[in-house]
Amino acid sequence: MLRNQVLVYCSEGVSPYYLRHTIRFLKYYSTQEGAFDILRVDGNFLIKNPFWEETTRLLVFPGGADRPYHRVLHGLGTARIFQYVSEGGNFLGICAGAYFGSKMIYFYEPEGAPLQGARDLGFFPGTAKGPAYRGNFSYVSPSGVRVSPQLFSDFGLGYAMFNGGCFFEGSEGYPGVNIESRYDDLPGKPASIVSRIVSKGLAVLSGPHIEYLPHYCRMVKENVQKTREFLQRERTTLDRYCQNLVQRLRQPAFSKADC
């Protein structure tokens, strides 16, 4: 059966703001090769619909809060997602979706003790730790939004929007993990975007908000305005990376000739 759908998770924990950017991002970078059907789905769909794996090329988890993702999908939901990728599907997790796609998370809460715990998917087999830039993150305001210099492995220095995302701790020590980008201005330049072939499928996890399209942003908070204006000027490298990324995610990780 032809896999011609992109499913975007839209349930408890997903930020409506980042969901809109994610949908626009997928449409924007898919126009050159013909649009896929982009569907918003909830946890009930992923758990109970018996056929979604057969028609889905890419499953996307946008930004928001990871804990509700885990609470809703833990068990049967995550088992089906992992099996879907193993059998040739592709997965993209951005910010909260990247935490959700890792084996362990460690998150410095704005108040109180850090959140730490295991997650089911383990596409990154280590700890997603964040926020990578500490000090300003908030669940209720965009105070943590900032520009993040990114050193892309194949495209050089670029910039992306950041708000609460992770870095992938010790990523160099895990066989099969490909570091696609690093935080260029943080000590040790930790991995910010990683990918991994999982049997026949591809999983990509991104700490920064690579889906953010500044020309759609209407927020008036000063730090958001500065971020938007900067990224409107300095977008060439990120644009090249995103074009390449979406092209890869729209294709099978392995062709029939590779099998």
UniProtKB/Swiss-Prot annotation:
Coiled coil: none
Disulfide-linked positions: none
Superkingdom of the organism of origin: Bacteria
InterPro entries given in the database record: Biotin-prot_ligase_N (IPR019197), Class_I_gatase-like (IPR029062), UCP016642 (IPR015834)
CDD domains xref list: GATase1_ScBLP_like
Any Pfam family matching the protein: BPL_N
Family affiliation: Belongs to the chlamydial CPn_0128/CT_035/TC_0305 family.
Name of the protein described by the UniProt record: Uncharacterized protein CPn_0128/CP_0643/CPj0128/CpB0130
Organism the protein comes from: Chlamydia pneumoniae
